[in-house]
Amino acid sequence: VTGKHRANEERPVPRPPRRGFSVGRVHRFSESLALSNAYADAEWWIPIYRQAFPKLMTAVSIREDGWAQRGGIDRVLTLQCGRTYTVDEKVRTENWPDILLEQWSDEERRIPGWIQKPLACDFIAYDYAPTETCYLLPVAPLQRAWRQRGREWIVAYGTRRARNPGYVSVGVPVPRDVLMQAIVDAMRLATNERRSIPMQLLPSPSQASLPF
């Protein structure tokens, strides 16, 4: 689900403290949490969620470090019927034509990134701040699409590394239209379909000598 929003011009949208600093590029948790909190009050979130869920009653931001934050939950949505959904909010400060899927949070220690580790959230809200556009990605089909197509995407689109003190994280930039179609395909289930091999078994791009 995608949504386009426009912030109220009378109240500026909160911006991160450092320009060019994107959610997901630096994976030290305290810094990522601080940046997430900088955007938590942005005026676009509620209109986006009301587009996706017209019967939305509340949208509670989760800011404290705890199991919910570390499980990928930034906001809890409650509908009139009592149904709740949990969302991981990611913001990119540049309008790149792709969605960057974090394969490894720490490449050397083989700590999986959010695309292949278990997440507690139902959706990932992937927002491009400059164009005021958000993609609401259902986590289960998204991760199944990765299991089905991840190898293909690594070869086709390469990887992007973020070098941080003591560790390197790795992401795969998948074009938005390609990822959207893969999610749709992942929603089709067949009992005779061959089971996908978990992406955790993949060698790192450097070990596999893949083009970057």
Please give the residue ranges for each predicted region.
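Short beta-strand or tight-loop elements
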Residues: 71-73, 120
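Conserved catalytic cores of phosphodiester-cleaving nucleases, focusing on short active-site segments
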Residues: 75-77, 81-95
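Non-catalytic C-terminal interaction segments of nucleic acid-processing enzymes
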Residues: 19-33, 78-81, 130-212
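Assembly/interface hotspot detector across virion components, adhesins/toxins, and nucleic-acid enzymes
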Residues: 56-57, 125, 156-161
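Catalytic cores of nucleic-acid endonucleases
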Residues: 28-33, 90-134
